Amino acid sequence: EALRQELQTISIENEALTAEVQGLQAEMAQQSALPQAIEEQKAEGFRLLSALERQIKAGESDRKIAYLTFDDGPYDNTTAAILDILKEKGVHATFFLRNRPDHVAEIRREIREGHSIANHSYSHKIRAVYESAASCIREIRDQQAWLTETVGVTPEIYRFPGGSPTAGKNKAAIAAALAADGLGYVDWNCYTGDGLPGELTAEKAYRTAISTVGDQKIVVMLMHDYSAATLAALPDIIDTLKAEGYLMMPLFKDSVMIRWA
């Protein structure tokens, strides 16, 4: 009788363990499928946004679009705070990522909350990235592979560290490799100034952002995850852009690619 009861107990425990394992497997499968499902939903939104861009460029719409972008992250504290603000304000952005294996949770959150993730090179070490066209292409492809393997999303947009002119004579070869790999690239046409030398206050970041937007109807704003000044100015920047009629969305491959000569 004691043996029978023990066997029953083991059987019940096994059933509970099996159910727990199956539940965990289902949860893992759901989490694995989530990035792809989100990207599919965003693709439909991007199709509509692309049509709006064409109307704006043709002068057939009074709407305006602001693409908020954040480079070099993720970073401790500031990236999460940026995401909190974006969520509170109900807007979306694009995060140009370097290789930050200790910050995968933030990248997953960026995807989960509907933002675009993009490629900003593997190391972001300027000398290493731009040693040659081949070194830059290798950095891009290494980061593509890492993001695909780590978070299940393959970026479709690249931003040259320092902007595309930083590539110098190698820019054409790198751009050709990007196109062959199915990536677009983008620079920017407005900014907070958080990547420039000198002290930056929140007030100055705000004034710089709004003044460089000017009367442009489609803007790509450069900001950086690490900047406390940008973080402090961000709510006011978003509020002002909203008041001026800007729709704030994440970049996508077929969106207007602001590129410098």
Identify the residue ranges that each predicted region occupies.
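Catalytic domains of cell-wall/extracellular-matrix polysaccharide-remodeling enzymes
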Residues: 81, 124-247, 252-261
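Active-site beta->alpha N-cap acidic-glycine motif
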Residues: 39-131, 135-154, 240, 256
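N-terminal pre-catalytic segment of deacetylase/amide-hydrolase enzymes
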Residues: 1-68, 75-82, 88, 204, ...
